[in-house]
Design a protein with these regions (language model features):
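Short acidic/polar N-terminal linker immediately downstream of export determinants
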Residues: 1-31, 40-60, 75-77
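Extended, compositionally simple hydrophobic/Ser/Thr-rich segments
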Residues: 2-13, 57-59, 63-174
Length: 174
């Protein structure tokens, strides 16, 4: 399953057998917050971009393949997820705190000033960062890491078997 958040949405994700979605914001603003499932993707957004109260969404989900956050969304894994493949796409100033007990393949695609912190285990980690992105995966045990950074991005990674990295502009990989 997939999740797409647009705007300034705070999302707390919990891996659990039962699926659930709870939205919290100011009562008078709640009708402007939309959650809909389109082609297997849960979309979360606001129909009113002028008013900016905090919008918090708690999601319980058993499996996850893609998270896309645009604008200034904040994604937080509340427990460690066990997944096969996970693709994280961040645009704008969105942030993600990823916790994995196991994953075969983890992919990050960040454009803008997004930030990702990831911990746990992912056999293969692929990263693409453009702009002023910050990626911290030092606490993510990965066998294979492939990374390409452009602009003024910064990444901290760990690879136990294979590393292929390219940094362009004033980007830095450590």
């Amino acid at each position: 399953s997939s999740i797409e958040a647009s705007g300034a949405i705070e999302i707390d994700l919990t891996q659990q057998p039962n699926q659930s979605v709870t939205v919290n914001t100011l009562r008078e603003y709640l009708p402007n917050v939309k959650t809909e499932v389109v082609d297997g993707k849960l979309k979360i957004y606001s129909t009113d971009n002028l008013i900016k109260p905090v919008i918090k969404v708690q999601i319980g989900i058993d499996s996850l393949s893609t998270i896309e956050a645009r604008g200034a969304s904040d994604i937080d894994f509340k427990n460690s997820f066990a997944l096969k493949d996970l693709n994280i796409i961040l645009r704008g100033t969105s942030k993600a705190d990823i916790k994995l007990s196991s994953a075969q393949k983890l992919e990050f695609d960040i454009q803008g000033a997004g930030k990702i912190h990831a911990s746990g285990v992912a056999d293969t980690l692929n990263i693409r960062g453009d702009g002023a992105s910050k990626i911290d995966t030092e606490k993510l045990g990965s066998k294979v890491v492939r990374i390409e950074l452009n602009g003024a991005s910064h990444a901290e990674v760990f690879a136990s078997e294979s590393f292929d990295g390219h940094a362009f502009g004033v980007s830095k990989i450590s």
